[in-house]
Amino acid sequence: MSYTPAIEVRHEKTLLIRSEFLNHYGTLFGVYMMQWADDMAYNAASLAIPSANFVTKLFGQFDFTSAVRGGDIIKIYSQVESIGNTSCKIKVWAVNARTNADVFRTFAVMVNVREGKAVPLEKI
């Protein structure tokens, strides 16, 4: 059983895409977006339920919808979508800050653990 949090808080991070983030095609190397998505999912989950000890359980498909090039500024967002018994689902997406074009979408499931085992979340 899951429920949607009463207060929907959206988290935001703004990044300048520097040369060290680029692949051999001059576009953003996908692993950086994946790392930032994981960071943002953790932040959203942990700020929504501060008493939890979250780890990443899984990610949905990483959908890169448009290229990000050096010098672009992107905004990455995360938001708790639903909260279950031991975990929560976080949506993560990014847009080009100058053009507002979608560049990336995914979701993460963050699970509350103690001693390596999933444990129930305290309801907020």
What do the PLM-derived regions correspond to, one by one?
Residues 7-9, 64, 69-70, 81-124:
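HotDog/MaoC-like acyl-thioester-processing domains
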